[in-house]
Amino acid sequence: MPKRRDILAIVLIVLPWTLLITVWHQSTLAPLLAVHKDEGSDPRRETPPGADPREYCTSDRDIVEVVRTEYVYTRPPPWSDTLPTIHVVTPTYSRPVQKAELTRMANTLLHVPNLHWLVVEDAPRRTPLTARLLRDTGLNYTHLHVETPRNYKLRGDARDPRIPRGTMQRNLALRWLRETFPRNSSQPGVVYFADDDNTYSLELFEEMRSTRRVSVWPVAFVGGLRYEAPRVNGAGKVVGWKTVFDPHRPFAIDMAGFAVNLRLILQRSQAYFKLRGVKGGYQESSLLRELVTLNDLEPKAANCTKILVWHTRTEKPVLVNEGKKGFTDPSVEI
């Protein structure tokens, strides 16, 4: 049997700890209980005698709406007279994930100052879905459309590398820029071809804003590699390409890996992407060789060592149950 003094020693050790834990629980829970009590009957929200309670509900809703407007929807940033405008050219086409991808992209572009979004649909007319989405973003945008001929469209799920994607849409955007701005325009700007299935760092847009002729940087998840990049020497000049697929292309670079000064686009009016007679992977070269030489390229992103754009692509949804047992509602826009 334990001795009496052993029991006393245990009590003297346990009792102080019990008291400490009890006090701590009371100090922690008391404010929470007070908060819940206040939520149940907040004296500050009691309707004064003779007042209409509906007026107070409306006032609360107005306050919430003001907060939402001021802190959530105050985008894009105010326009600056000193920053060059970034003209982002995005070809797009109708598919289940189109709205999701354009929404994700818009949420990025809303944080970029002095940005103009040129969205070009591969369609015979501008679709209501894209028109509503662009209008609701609050971005400075232009909505165009041109349909790719049937013989240049993909058939089924197979990807034919000989068939260029988005070429006519990008070319229409180039034509729009040349028709909108005079050839000798002093308007400072940069043109960037940004597909809607990529992920973009905000830092990328500030990197490209200072483009004098053509700036370049790495792109992740392309060419079967973690990333492809321009090869830059110790003097900071582009001397080649870090890629496996046809590294001897004139410009072995992804569409998301370069930006062009607007004045260069306006001055070289013959420069377009080639639709015919161009092998897969040569679309970028077909435009850039009309604008610059390798020696003219300006490496960005810490001499092409930082990844600021990823060719992520949205997973194609598996809609095998769509239309079964009355679950389909075509009126719901996705």
UniProtKB/Swiss-Prot annotation:
The active site is at residue 284. It holds the Pfam family Glyco_transf_43. Glycans are attached at residues 140, 184, 303. GO terms for biological process: carbohydrate metabolic process; chondroitin sulfate proteoglycan biosynthetic process; protein glycosylation; visual learning. Its EC number is 2.4.1.135. It is an enzyme of class 2 (transferase). Mainly expressed in the brain. The record marks 228, 321 as: Interaction with galactose moiety of substrate glycoprotein. UDP-alpha-D-glucuronate binds at residues 91-93, 122, 165, 170, 195-197, 311-313. The soluble form derives from the membrane form by proteolytic processing. Involved in the biosynthesis of L2/HNK-1 carbohydrate epitope on glycoproteins. Can also play a role in glycosaminoglycan biosynthesis. Substrates include asialo-orosomucoid (ASOR), asialo-fetuin, and asialo-neural cell adhesion molecule. Requires sphingomyelin for activity: stearoyl-sphingomyelin was the most effective, followed by palmitoyl-sphingomyelin and lignoceroyl-sphingomyelin. Activity was demonstrated only for sphingomyelin with a saturated fatty acid and not for that with an unsaturated fatty acid, regardless of the length of the acyl group. This is Galactosylgalactosylxylosylprotein 3-beta-glucuronosyltransferase 1.
